[in-house]
Amino acid sequence: MKAVFDTNILVDYLGGSEAARGELARYRVRLISIITVIELMVGAKDSREEAAIRGLLSSFEILELSAEIAQEAVVIRKELRLKIPDAIVYATARTQGCLLVSRNTRELKSDWPDIRISYHL
């Protein structure tokens, strides 16, 4: 099974969350949006954190922003009123035909198609 992971899952993993670790282990094919890469790297406080992030990123297939993803993000933004980064990450999952795994219950709803709210902190 494959899934696109939202940034919050990776942040939790880097913080030592067992729930995040278990969630990542559920999926054989793990994908992330280039948006997640940007969000993680911007949040790194020092070179040690950057190295930890790069190590984690090496275990994911990173999906670039394509015209197809951009168009789907426009549809999502208009229909669901998500912020642009969230719309791009969700569009990435939809265009790949897989789940978006997140714990973002503020913007995402578990009853939306292709969304898995995996745990709560």
Where in this protein do the model-derived segments appear?
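Short active-site oxyanion
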Residues: 1, 27-29, 59-61, 94-99
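Short, well-structured N-terminal submotif of metal-dependent ribonuclease cores
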Residues: 1-32, 41-55
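Histidine- and aromatic-rich ligand-binding microenvironments
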Residues: 5-6, 32-33, 82-83, 104-105, ...
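Alpha-helix capping/helix-boundary segments
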Residues: 9-10, 36, 69, 88-89, ...
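Acidic, PIN/NYN-like endoribonuclease modules and their adjacent C-terminal/linker elements
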Residues: 17, 90, 94-121
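Acidic catalytic patch
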Residues: 58-79
